Swiss-Prot record:
<dbReference type="GO" id="GO:0003735">
    <property type="term" value="F:structural constituent of ribosome"/>
</dbReference>
<dbReference type="InterPro" id="IPR002222">
    <property type="entry name" value="Ribosomal_uS19"/>
</dbReference>
<dbReference type="GO" id="GO:0000028">
    <property type="term" value="P:ribosomal small subunit assembly"/>
</dbReference>
<dbReference type="GO" id="GO:0005737">
    <property type="term" value="C:cytoplasm"/>
</dbReference>
<dbReference type="GO" id="GO:0006412">
    <property type="term" value="P:translation"/>
</dbReference>
<dbReference type="GO" id="GO:0015935">
    <property type="term" value="C:small ribosomal subunit"/>
</dbReference>
<keyword id="KW-0687">Ribonucleoprotein</keyword>
<keyword id="KW-0694">RNA-binding</keyword>
<dbReference type="InterPro" id="IPR023575">
    <property type="entry name" value="Ribosomal_uS19_SF"/>
</dbReference>
<dbReference type="InterPro" id="IPR020934">
    <property type="entry name" value="Ribosomal_uS19_CS"/>
</dbReference>
<dbReference type="Pfam" id="PF00203">
    <property type="entry name" value="Ribosomal_S19"/>
</dbReference>
<comment type="similarity">
    <text>Belongs to the universal ribosomal protein uS19 family.</text>
</comment>
<dbReference type="InterPro" id="IPR005732">
    <property type="entry name" value="Ribosomal_uS19_bac-type"/>
</dbReference>
<keyword id="KW-0699">rRNA-binding</keyword>
<comment type="function">
    <text>Protein S19 forms a complex with S13 that binds strongly to the 16S ribosomal RNA.</text>
</comment>
<protein>
    <recommendedName>
        <fullName>Small ribosomal subunit protein uS19</fullName>
    </recommendedName>
</protein>
<keyword id="KW-0689">Ribosomal protein</keyword>
Amino acid sequence: MTRSVWKGPFVDGYMLNKADASRASGRNEIIKIWSRRSTILPQFVGLTFGVYNGRKFLPVQVTENMVGHKFGEFSPTRTFNGHAADKKAKRG
């Protein structure tokens, strides 16, 4: 079920403050965030966020196509190493 339209997008408050401070400084440094649940807003376009995936911060450069999505969509938490090989087929 999607979020109600009347509620609006969810963004943690500290992220707005960090984004405004980064824009004011003019330096394009990585903004570390832990909030994977926050929605990407149009004012974040052009900024680089370090999204925490449980182990490390993955850099995410925000583009216009990402607006409306969540930060967690661009920082995978699991690594897929492939399925186990069939041992009987290898012995031949």
